[in-house]
Amino acid sequence: ILIMDEPFAALGAQTREIMQAELLRIWRESGKTVLFITHQINEAIYLADRVIVFGARPGKVKEMIKIDLARPRDLSIKRDPKFLQYEDRLWTLIEEEVKKTMIQDQVVHNINN
């Protein structure tokens, strides 16, 4: 298993896409399992077979989504309607969790003040 925790976070957009393609090539050739942690929704969809969304505090798995997009993938997949549907679904899930956290933080702030 190869565990990667936001390895492309500090890269510019073009370099990030080159490295994503390189990771897909390495994965395809090696057959290794890759656990890839990212905050970038489109990166998760592009690279993954499954995307796991964590919930608000305490961190728990909110949902696991199977990404049913053809392989091999190239950057053109990001314009596919199915890709965009996954992106919308993930944004909605994450937005729900952000709102929960904001409400919890506001309640704690109000209690402490």
Task: Walk through the language-model features, giving the residues of each.
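Short, glycine/charged-rich "phosphate-handling" switch motifs in NTP-dependent
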Residues: 50
